[in-house]
């Protein structure tokens, strides 16, 4: 199927309803033999490395728990360098750069604004001209999201939206894809200034859950912006949330505060806790 045909199909497909149904199915307990056979088939199809998983297949009673599985302790050591920025996830770099007057690159010839992404022009202003990167999490990847630097969680924004796929065809053809899909933004104050960790939903990514509060997306609730009155500390590498299936994370920093490593290029594979940049 070519990209144009795929996009036309996605245009008419009831993506939100499909994601709801898939999400419900992943949370349903089913007979263990059937469930374990399905998980094993999924792991084989997507080349999931269960040697890295905290537990074996038998430990996960639902697909949702399998998707959000933890890693074996110590498997992803976090670079403790004082000025080191670490990857918040396991994934592959889709784009990376420094925003040009608040504009970021989605794909060749397609840009979006930080204002659109965060849904709040005031919240977006501090990130104009700053470092940003987009990291894609495939179905085989570890689906939890962590802090790239230590600091405090200052608030979050839940922005309801659509459920377009975030595969290459959509990224190359859907204008402002990451700004129309549902997302959950976590705001941090770090040693490198303000940081936004944007978790973007997608088709069949039924929910995004925060680790620091009772926040779950795609539950029929309206959008919400919340600022914490007291500091909520988070260490570098501390868990911020999780996807029920893979999707995309976008990091935003203030200008002249973070410089990306030369190795952080488009299509580069990144691992949680590994260095991707430095504080300047």
Swiss-Prot record:
The record marks 246-247 as: Cleavage (non-hydrolytic). It is an enzyme of class 4 (lyase). GO terms for molecular function: phosphatidylserine decarboxylase activity. GO terms for biological process: phosphatidylethanolamine biosynthetic process. It holds the Pfam family PS_Dcarbxylase. It is a peripheral membrane protein. Its EC number is 4.1.1.65. The modification Pyruvic acid (Ser) is found at residue 247. It catalyses: a 1,2-diacyl-sn-glycero-3-phospho-L-serine + H(+) = a 1,2-diacyl-sn-glycero-3-phosphoethanolamine + CO2. Is synthesized initially as an inactive proenzyme. Formation of the active enzyme involves a self-maturation process in which the active site pyruvoyl group is generated from an internal serine residue via an autocatalytic post-translational modification. Two non-identical subunits are generated from the proenzyme in this reaction, and the pyruvate is formed at the N-terminus of the alpha chain, which is derived from the carboxyl end of the proenzyme. The keyword Lyase applies. Binds 1 pyruvoyl group covalently per subunit. It is found in: Cell membrane. Its cofactor is pyruvate. Pathway: Phospholipid metabolism; phosphatidylethanolamine biosynthesis; phosphatidylethanolamine from CDP-diacylglycerol: step 2/2. NCBIfam families: PS_decarb (TIGR00163). Heterodimer of a large membrane-associated beta subunit and a small pyruvoyl-containing alpha subunit. HAMAP family: PS_decarb_PSD_B_type1 (MF_00662). PANTHER family: PHOSPHATIDYLSERINE DECARBOXYLASE (PTHR10067), PHOSPHATIDYLSERINE DECARBOXYLASE PROENZYME, MITOCHONDRIAL (PTHR10067:SF6). This is Phosphatidylserine decarboxylase proenzyme. The gene is psd.
């Amino acid at each position: 199927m070519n990209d144009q045909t795929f996009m036309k199909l996605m245009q008419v497909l009831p993506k939100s309803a499909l994601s709801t149904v898939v999400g419900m199915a992943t949370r349903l307990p089913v007979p263990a033999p059937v469930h374990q056979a399905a998980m094993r088939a999924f792991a084989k199809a997507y080349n999931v490395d269960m040697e890295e998983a905290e537990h074996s297949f038998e430990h996960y009673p639902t697909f949702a728990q399998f998707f959000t599985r933890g890693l074996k302790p110590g498997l992803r050591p976090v670079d403790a360098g004082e000025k080191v920025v670490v990857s918040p996830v396991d994934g592959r770099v889709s784009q990376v750069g420094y925003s040009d007057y608040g504009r970021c690159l989605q794909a060749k010839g397609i840009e979006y604004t930080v204002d659109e992404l965060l849904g709040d022009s005031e919240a977006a202003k501090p990130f104009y001209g700053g470092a940003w990167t987009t990291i894609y999490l495939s179905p085989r990847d570890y689906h939890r999201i962590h802090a790239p630097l230590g600091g405090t969680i200052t608030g979050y924004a839940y922005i309801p939206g659509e459920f377009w796929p975030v595969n290459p065809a959509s990224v190359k053809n859907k204008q402002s894809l990451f700004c129309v899909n549902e997302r959950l933004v976590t705001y941090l104050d770090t040693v490198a200034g303000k940081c936004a960790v944007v978790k973007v939903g997608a088709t069949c990514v039924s929910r995004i859950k925060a680790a620091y509060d009772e926040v779950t997306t795609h539950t029929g609730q309206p959008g919400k912006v919340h600022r914490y009155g007291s500091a909520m500390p988070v260490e570098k590498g501390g868990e911020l949330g999780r996807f029920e299936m893979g999707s995309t994370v976008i990091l935003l920093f203030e200008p002249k505060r973070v410089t990306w490593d030369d190795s952080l290029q488009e299509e580069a594979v990144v691992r949680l806790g590994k260095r991707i940049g430095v504080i300047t």
